[in-house]
């Protein structure tokens, strides 16, 4: 909407990224677990500093037309993921507008399949359960068309703590009480 357009125009905002995040079930080569899947837009992919934290493989969410994902080091270790392997991971999520069928459980679950292109390491909390993938794949998995669960902003280079407080105050005022505006430490 208009409020979000005005946020993009705020002189302190350097990057504006749409995200869609949800916990999903992951199956990779016989290993299963729960992960926090974060769908990101192409702006995130182009400007992310995550590329500097890749420990294996590369930071790439697309190989030609094929979607790929990057995985936190702790999760990759637990699931035996390696970008050098040909195995793909399957991400599962219950279909939102359908009752769960005991007779045919597969009909109640959406699935997306993709290979890990890279493993990243930022900190243990993030590394243990995060998968980053294209927002289009996340929308397909969750049954959404254009919805997002959040907007991540990065301030322009050289911004101070005072600039951060000012930006949070301005953005909160712009969006109103129905939205939470948090810095990365308060999330």
Whereabouts are the PLM-identified features?
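Hydrophobic, regular-secondary-structure patches
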Residues: 1-36, 42, 53-65
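Hydrophobic secondary-structure segments that place a key small or acidic residue at a functional site
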Residues: 20, 38-40, 56-135
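Short glycine/proline-enriched turns and hinge-like loops at secondary-structure junctions
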Residues: 28-31, 82-84, 127, 145
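Short helix-loop capping/hinge motifs at secondary-structure junctions, enriched
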Residues: 44-48
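Mechanotransmission and gating elements of multispan inner-membrane complexes involved in transport
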Residues: 93-99, 103-187
